[in-house]
């Protein structure tokens, strides 16, 4: 009888543990993109990557422009990717300010899901890129999550 009680308790415990582990699975098990909150660490990484495009050190910028920063994850089974779009803000020198004009006025970024991956910046300035005229580097599914205008490659006006 003791063996049966022990076996039953062990079975019940394992079933409970399995159910608990199953409930902890990600809410998006499919390939649906997920909008992510911008963290201080990601913000610092984007400033660093964006500064590369300007040719100026990241220390010459105070951060990212509020209200124009986006961050998402695309859990694609073959190529999971993080996406971001932002504008550097608070240039601390005239040269840094000049380098944020035109081509560098808005930037898009991507990186793979590997923890060692780094952000790849893309200059998207010179005004908005209408989808179709020039391929938008950010997939439409991500732009939809960010609620950008349909078929456009830029955020909605503030």
How would you name each of these model-derived features?
Residues 12, 23-40, 129-130, 148-158:
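N-terminal low-complexity, Pro/Thr-rich disordered segments
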Residues 25, 53, 58, 66, ...:
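Polar low-complexity intrinsically disordered regions enriched in Ser/Thr and small residues
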Residues 83-158:
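Extracytosolic low-complexity repeat regions of secreted or lipid-anchored proteins
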Residues 59-62, 81-87:
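Short linear motifs at secondary-structure transitions and domain/linker junctions
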Residues 75-78:
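Structural signature of eukaryotic scaffold interfaces centered on beta-propeller domains
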Residues 31-72:
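Short, non-transmembrane alpha-helical segments in secretory-pathway proteins
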Residues 21, 49, 54, 62, ...:
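Feature targets compositionally biased, intrinsically disordered low-complexity regions
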Residues 1-29:
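Secretory targeting and sorting signals
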């Amino acid at each position: 009888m003791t063996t049966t009680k022990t076996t039953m308790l062990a079975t019940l415990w394992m079933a409970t543990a399995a159910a608990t582990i199953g409930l902890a699975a990600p809410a998006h098990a499919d390939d649906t993109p997920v909008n992510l909150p911008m963290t201080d660490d990601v913000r610092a990484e984007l400033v660093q990557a964006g500064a590369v495009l300007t040719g100026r050190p990241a220390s010459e910028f105070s951060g990212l422009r509020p209200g124009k920063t986006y961050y998402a994850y695309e859990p694609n089974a073959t190529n999971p990717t993080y996406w971001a779009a932002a504008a550097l803000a608070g240039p601390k020198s005239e040269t840094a300010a000049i380098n944020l004009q035109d081509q560098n006025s808005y930037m898009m970024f991507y990186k793979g899901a590997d923890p060692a991956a780094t952000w790849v910046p893309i200059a998207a300035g010179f005004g908005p890129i209408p989808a179709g005229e020039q391929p938008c580097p950010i997939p439409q599914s991500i732009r939809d999550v960010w609620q950008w205008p349909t078929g456009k490659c830029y955020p909605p006006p503030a």
